[in-house]
Amino acid sequence: MESLLTLPLAGEARVRILQITDTHLFAQKHEALLGVNTWESYQAVLEAIRPHQHEFDLIVATGDLAQDQSSAAYQHFAEGIASFRAPCVWLPGNHDFQPAMYSALQDAGISPAKRVFIGEQWQILLLDSQVFGVPHGELSEFQLEWLERKLADAPERHTLLLLHHHPLPAGCSWLDQHSLRNAGELDTVLAKFPHVKYLLCGHIHQELDLDWNGRRLLATPSTCVQFKPHCSNFTLDTIAPGWRTLELHADGTLTTEVHRLADTRFQPDTASEGY
């Protein structure tokens, strides 16, 4: 039976969501990605969030949680959020190894649910855009059919759609070759369902807020390394790691804000030419 997570939403109340993405953790906590210790940057982000953790009703982790595909990396992710009271749901990114991801996160009590009902007004659907072994994304026929079924059976619910890969160009040609390859097929499905108003992704390690045929498309900074916007070639940014908060309101509106660490201690090796 398909796993469904249900969250209450009373009256005109809002549901507050924390998005964490692209943590790129390793089995060994001392390891670094492009000069940034990803465990330490993840911990710093969580410490910045922790004073406000009681405000969140749900945590969404939108892929690339591990860099080395190890079970230990996913255990470290779970360790980081263990003190947060909000449930967490997740989806895979191109760097993730799903068997280890599923097993380690489930063992840690993190839900494998790919559908979340929020009161009577909202649903969140989590898609798997991973094509294992390559950086670009694609939604399988199964995923597209699953999406269409879930949208059709809840037409009264405002819908937030989550996936790892960005379906629209971000303006970085080196990144955009690794986007969602069959975004047109996704658009065809979504065109049938006007209650899908928002999409949220990770992958591009930078903030993005675009209109996609009347839908709002959001992307969020990584908790570690940042990619510099509007660059044709691989370029790292020196801006601090970040995360996103979102509020879903009973009337179908969404408000959101990107947050970043206040200091600049997590500086990448800007001479790096890729990873």
Swiss-Prot record:
Manner of cofactor binding, per the entry note: Binds 2 Fe(2+) ions per subunit.
Domain of life: Bacteria
Gene3D superfamilies noted in UniProt: 3.60.21.10
Reaction equations catalysed: 3',5'-cyclic AMP + H2O = AMP + H(+)
Matches recorded under Pfam families: Metallophos
Keyword Nucleotide-binding set for record: yes
Enzyme Commission number(s): 3.1.4.53
The UniProt record lists the keyword Metal-binding: yes
Residue sites binding Fe cation 2 per the record: 64, 94, 164, 203
Binding-site residues for Fe cation 1, renumbered to this chain: 22, 24, 64, 205
Sorted UniProt keywords: cAMP, Hydrolase, Iron, Metal-binding, Nucleotide-binding
Binding site for AMP: 24, 64, 94-95, 205
Similarity section: Belongs to the cyclic nucleotide phosphodiesterase class-III family.
Function: Hydrolyzes cAMP to 5'-AMP. Plays an important regulatory role in modulating the intracellular concentration of cAMP, thereby influencing cAMP-dependent processes. Specific for cAMP.
Protein's UniProt name: 3',5'-cyclic adenosine monophosphate phosphodiesterase CpdA
The species this protein was found in: Escherichia coli (strain K12)
